[in-house]
Amino acid sequence: MSLAETLLWLCKIPSPIGEERELCDRVSERLSRVNLAGPIRRYGESIVVPLTRGHGGPHVALAGHLDVVRTVHDGPARIEGDRLYAAGAADMKSGLALMLDLAENPERPALDLTLVFYAREEGPFAENELGPVLDQDPELRHVSVAVALEPSDNKLQLGCGGSLHATARFRGRTAHSARPW
């Protein structure tokens, strides 16, 4: 399956925040057919996938969230010309497609690589499953570097943390708060 086909496959599986179970199940099932360095470990609606081991170099983790912002106006997932349109196509399913492509490609990178697919990033910090996954998975405590494949204008950017809790009402089209344009 090409990278674009994998992205379309992911985008056809709805996964608005709080409804990641089907996508988590389908990604787990797809990865169960791949030669992995160990068993897939599940925590709630999140999975940790040991892809490669034994290279003696750095242990790298790639992370991406399974949930997307809930939308009602995007229409079905589709390819038009050289573009793919769907809820979550850029944030975050493009990163997930890359992770699946790495797993399914027989030419693996020469490093110890772990993939982390986690739930509930798009909502309140208290519900985000990444923290509990990092706390519960003993192997993730020893990674050399972790990269969140969150889109950031195609540039490597330092992450930020923090939260603001408020109630607000807006009218208009759904947009991601980091890039509302």
Q: Can you describe what each PLM-predicted range is?
A:
Residues 97-165:
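Acidic/histidine-rich catalytic neighborhood of metal-dependent amide-processing enzymes
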Residues 51, 170-172:
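Short beta-strand-to-loop capping motifs
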Residues 58-117, 125, 139:
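Active-site metal-coordination/substrate-binding segment of hydrolases
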Residues 65-69, 152, 173:
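Short glycine-rich anion-binding loops that position phosphate/pyrophosphate groups of nucleotides
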Residues 6-9, 15-57, 77-78:
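A non-catalytic alpha/beta surface segment that caps or lines the substrate-entry region
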Residues 178-181:
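Acidic-enriched catalytic cores of C-N bond-cleaving enzymes acting on peptides and small amides
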Residues 14, 31, 62-65, 99, ...:
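Buried hydrophobic positions in well-ordered alpha/beta secondary-structure cores of metabolic enzymes
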Residues 1-13, 160-162:
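N-terminal hydrophobic or amphipathic helices/low-complexity stretches enriched
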